[in-house]
UniProtKB/Swiss-Prot annotation:
Transmembrane segments: 38-57, 58-76, 174-194, 198-218, 262-282
Main subcellular localisation: endoplasmic reticulum
Family affiliation: Belongs to the fatty acid desaturase type 1 family.
Enzymatic class: oxidoreductase
Stored InterPro entries: Acyl-CoA_DS, FA_desaturase_dom
Compartment(s) of residence: Endoplasmic reticulum membrane
GO biological process: unsaturated fatty acid biosynthetic process
Short sequence motif named Histidine box-3, residue ranges: 246-250
Cofactor(s) the record lists: Fe cation
GO cellular component term, pick one: endoplasmic reticulum membrane
Origin organism lineage: Eukaryota, Viridiplantae, Streptophyta, Embryophyta, Tracheophyta
Organism (species): Arabidopsis thaliana
Name the record gives this protein: Delta-9 desaturase-like 3 protein
PANTHER family: ACYL-COA DESATURASE, DELTA-9 DESATURASE-LIKE 1 PROTEIN-RELATED
Length: 299
């Protein structure tokens, strides 16, 4: 499906493996400890979920998981990071707030990291570069904030967000929002709701996102002549809200649509298109035919 060129070996050779940085025996910052604790708690709750199954909990988890992870891709990624479309603030802010509960951090941090990824893709300065191994690009990079700072410098690439009081507020209070959410979920549905929505939903959301950083730079197909190892993995499309059309994305970073063919499932694009039809999403960016011809591997 959509595989114009399968496993282009020349692109894979661009990522030269780098010597691994020490993971356990290093200085851990407070943020590192908080992150590993949160990720560990989510996976522990996931392990407890089979012993706390109810249909209501499963249904609630599906609703929370889809809405929060769709908010990540719709808000954090395509709206805030790449500015691929514009929203009125009364609509932009609620989506950004909803994304908090996907447990991937606040907008300033997430957007800054992803902008660095595109600026330094597959290089020594890429925050989650595949040249440092699958598990580093998949998850370990998250727990070494000092290393990210060494490679990329300060987060001065998100001044557009730092200038807005709402995003500064989320940055300073994210822990309070997450803890309050977990408490409310527990009070509403007990352990079944907590283990399934936070545990199972959180773990699936984590690994779906992380596979874009790891697997989508190692396996899959390439349709576009990008100067990196980005790839499309079709079967991940529904689970990642359309983000696994990663070679498409790296070819046209500003595009609001990642599934460029009609058969490439892209739930995030469907939501953007819906708001565009309503006149709420404006300045929606899409690649032109000339841009596609220039980037195509088939030319």
């Amino acid at each position: 499906m959509g595989d114009k060129n399968k496993d282009d070996s020349s692109s894979q050779s661009k990522a030269v493996r780098k010597e691994k940085r020490a993971f356990l025996f290093r200085k851990w910052t407070r943020v590192d400890v908080m992150r590993v604790s949160a990720v560990g708690a989510v996976h522990l709750l996931c392990l407890l979920a089979p012993f706390n199954y109810t249909w209501e909990a499963f249904r609630f988890a599906a609703m929370v998981g889809i809405s929060t992870n769709l908010s990540i891709t719709f808000s954090y990624h395509r709206n805030l990071t790449h500015r691929s479309f514009k929203l009125p603030k009364w609509l932009e802010y609620p989506f950004a707030y909803s994304a908090l509960f996907a447990l991937q951090g606040h907008p300033i941090d997430w957007v800054s990291t992803h902008r660095f990824h595109h600026q330094f893709t597959d290089s020594d300065r890429d925050p989650h570069s595949p040249i440092e191994g699958f598990w580093f690009s998949h998850v370990f990079w998250i727990f070494d904030t000092s290393y990210i700072r060494e490679k990329c410098g300060g987060r001065d690439n998100v001044m557009d967000l730092k200038q807005q009081w709402f995003y500064r507020f989320l940055q300073n209070t994210i822990g309070l929002h997450i803890l309050t959410f977990w408490i409310l979920v527990y009070l509403w549905g007990g352990l079944p709701y907590l283990t399934w929505s936070v545990g199972v939903g959180g773990a699936i959301g984590y690994h779906a996102t992380w596979l874009i950083n790891s697997a989508c730079h190692i396996w899959g197909s390439r349709a576009w002549n990008t100067k990196d190892t980005s790839r499309n993995i079709w079967w991940l499309g529904p689970f990642t809200m359309g983000e696994s059309w990663h070679n498409n994305h790296h070819a046209f970073e500003a595009s609001a649509r990642h599934g460029l063919e009609w058969y490439q499932v892209d739930l995030t694009w469907y939501l953007i298109w819906f708001f565009q039809v309503l006149g709420l999403a404006t300045d929606v960016k899409l690649p032109t035919d000339a841009q596609k011809r220039k980037m195509s591997l088939a030319r």
